[in-house]
């Protein structure tokens, strides 16, 4: 990767827009210090030591008007996130003041940064690779401490190290094969080369397949489980949603059909982010608005990773209950018998044995739902092993799957007795695909597309 430092100077607001204690406007580039100094009244920023914070005021150089009282952080290249000169202006939080300072910096010669451009420069300047750059956004978007743990390990380079070490081993193997082909001084050189390839490709395949086994857990922790709460009207779906959220998001009444649409909320269940979808009760109805909600509920059920089927334990099973039991039987399903605080009338013998009796009203057995989720998706294992490297990014997972396919092609070719020089092609392809993960062999279009998904100022 080429080290690029011939960039213009960019600027953006790095804190969320709105009222707050502070706002931060960031500059990065060769002229960052000069541009910041042109609007700063205080110490000469071009002469202060690196990694210092300096008190002063931002002024409009045209009018001399004071815009705000600020603290300015100065960080000199190359010991910065972008490996360029970086200035961060810490202002009082607020839309007007941060925008005013941003416009001043642009007027003085800075360019408005594109989404993710600061991190893109860190990548292009060799400060981080592509997996570490993606981890930056994963940290920002992490919904639980477990998801953040995985993202921090990726930012620290755990996945990069594993991929780079594997690529180097593949390169060493290719070099040895090439030597054996070019200098066939021994009669058994072909057998030696075949044995080497077989041993190494099986080793690489085993390593990457083990990494793929972490993908299910990692992806769930990163993206969450899409969880549909289903049941006929007025069995307690919205009450369950509110109980899990510990706040009133859904309307709870005794009137069947109150939830007429799909309500979505995130909740942290023992470190697992659940995207809870409270669906309208699935039943036949003449109400047009409710019909739309019912259809969306069926769609949510089809797309869900997890289904919470709520039944009313104080009533006998209805045809609607039986229909939902059949509709959800092939899903990752947890059957919840609600209203167990009332007299029980439901026919337990008609239900699978793995139901959980609960009372949303008294909070009975709600904790068992969390335990069952752990059992269904994590085989009762710990969510995150401290020293393990996890795959959680769909792009990484897809590329690792492709590398495993390439290695399988090498092994299949060896079994068929194909010439070694032809099998080199698949092994070389494996090396190239792994390079796409770290960015060493990623096309420019992919890099541009990835960083365009970042937020402004990052």
UniProtKB/Swiss-Prot annotation:
Keywords, comma-separated and alphabetical: Cytoplasm, GTP-binding, Hydrolase, Magnesium, Metal-binding, Nucleotide-binding, Potassium, tRNA processing
Residues that hold Mg(2+) according to the record: 238, 259
Enzyme class label: hydrolase
Keyword Hydrolase on entry: yes
UniProt cofactor(s): K(+)
Positions that bind K(+): 234, 253, 255, 258
Any single GO CC term annotated in Swiss-Prot or TrEMBL for this entry: cytosol
Function recorded in the entry: Exhibits a very high intrinsic GTPase hydrolysis rate. Involved in the addition of a carboxymethylaminomethyl (cmnm) group at the wobble position (U34) of certain tRNAs, forming tRNA-cmnm(5)s(2)U34.
Name of the protein in its database record: tRNA modification GTPase MnmE
Protein's organism: Streptococcus pyogenes serotype M3 (strain ATCC BAA-595 / MGAS315)
High-level lineage: Bacteria, Bacillati, Bacillota, Bacilli, Lactobacillales
Gene: mnmE
């Amino acid at each position: 990767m080429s080290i690029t430092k011939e960039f213009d100077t960019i600027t953006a607001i790095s804190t969320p827009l709105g009222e707050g204690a502070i706002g931060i406007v960031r500059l990065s580039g060769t002229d960052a210090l000069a541009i910041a100094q042109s609007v700063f009244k205080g110490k000469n920023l071009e002469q202060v030591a690196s990694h210092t914070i300096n008190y002063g005021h931002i002024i409009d150089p045209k009018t001399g008007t004071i815009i705000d009282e600020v603290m300015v952080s100065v960080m000199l290249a190359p010991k910065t996130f972008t490996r360029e000169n970086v200035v961060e202006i810490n202002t009082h939080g607020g839309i007007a003041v941060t925008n005013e300072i941003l416009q001043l910096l642009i007027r003085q010669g800075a360019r408005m940064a594109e989404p993710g451009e600061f991190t893109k420069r860190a990548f292009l300047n060799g400060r981080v690779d592509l997996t570490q750059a993606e981890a930056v956004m994963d940290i920002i978007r992490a919904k639980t401490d477990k998801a953040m743990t995985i993202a921090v390990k990726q930012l620290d380079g755990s996945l990069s190290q594993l991929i780079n070490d594997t690529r180097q081993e593949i390169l060493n193997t290719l070099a040895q094969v090439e030597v054996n082909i070019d200098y066939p001084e021994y009669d058994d050189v072909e057998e030696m080369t075949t044995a080497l390839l077989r041993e190494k490709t099986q080793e690489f395949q085993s390593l990457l397949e083990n990494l793929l086994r972490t993908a299910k857990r990692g992806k769930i922790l990163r993206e969450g489980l899409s969880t549909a709460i289903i049941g006929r009207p007025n069995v307690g779906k919205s009450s369950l949603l509110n109980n899990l959220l510990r706040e009133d998001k859904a309307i709870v009444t005794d009137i069947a059909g109150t939830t007429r649409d799909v309500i979505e909320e995130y909740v942290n269940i023992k470190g697992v982010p659940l995207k809870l979808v409270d669906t309208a009760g699935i039943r036949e109805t003449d109400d047009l608005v409710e019909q739309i909600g019912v259809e969306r509920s069926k769609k949510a059920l089809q797309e869900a990773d997890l289904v919470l089927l709520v039944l009313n334990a104080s009533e006998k099973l209805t045809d609607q209950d039986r229909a939902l039991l059949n509709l959800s039987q092939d899903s990752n399903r947890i059957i919840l018998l609600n209203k167990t605080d009332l007299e029980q009338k439901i026919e337990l013998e008609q239900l699978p044995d793995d139901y959980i009796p609960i009372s949303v009203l008294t909070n009975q057995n709600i904790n068992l739902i969390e335990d069952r989720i752990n059992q269904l998706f994590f085989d009762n294992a710990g969510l995150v092993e401290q020293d393990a490297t996890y795959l959680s990014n769909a792009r990484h997972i897809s590329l690792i799957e492709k590398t495993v396919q390439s290695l399988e092609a090498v092994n299949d070719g060896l079994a068929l007795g194909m010439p070694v020089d032809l099998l080199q092609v698949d092994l070389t392809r494996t090396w190239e695909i792994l390079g796409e993960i770290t960015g060493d062999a990623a096309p420019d279009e992919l890099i541009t597309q990835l960083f365009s998904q970042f937020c402004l100022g990052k």
